[in-house]
């Protein structure tokens, strides 16, 4: 059941960081930065660990490559979605860069290809359907 709240509650809130569980931050950094073109936003010591935050090429919410969440083992992130303006172009480029990606699939919500990072975290690269 929905709860009614003040109309200003969380009015300015947005998702800014999504944690991606990895086993090796350096290997993951090479994949996300060198292979996918993400930009490093922060790479700094963090409570005896390493805070590694990246932004996708088009901006928007960032990802943090994490090793410390006990209930998020490496490879457990599923259903992550990156939106693109041309999934077929990007699928061909992924293959050229050595990334295994499924053949593009058409669905009611757009055309997508699925890929995985070195730990097995699952991403969809999605091209939204053209508006009528």
PLM feature segments, named:
Residues 1-29, 60, 77-80, 129-132:
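N-terminal beta-strand motif that seeds the catalytic metal site of vicinal oxygen chelate
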Residues 7-10, 43, 53-55, 69-73, ...:
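Short secondary-structure boundary/capping segments
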């Amino acid at each position: 059941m929905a709860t009614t709240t003040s109309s200003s509650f969380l009015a300015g809130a947005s998702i800014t960081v999504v944690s991606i569980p990895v086993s090796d931050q350096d290997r993951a950094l090479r994949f996300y930065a060198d292979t996918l073109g993400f930009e490093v936003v922060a790479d700094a010591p963090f409570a005896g660990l390493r805070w590694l935050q990246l932004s996708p090429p088009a901006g928007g919410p960032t990802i943090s490559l994490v090793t410390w969440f006990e209930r998020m083992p490496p490879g457990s992130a599923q259903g992550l979605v990156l939106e693109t303006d041309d999934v077929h172009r990007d699928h061909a480029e992924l293959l050229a860069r050595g990334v295994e990606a499924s053949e593009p699939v058409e669905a009611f919500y757009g055309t997508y290809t699925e890929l995985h990072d070195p730990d097995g975290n699952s991403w969809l690269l999605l091209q939204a359907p053209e508006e009528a």
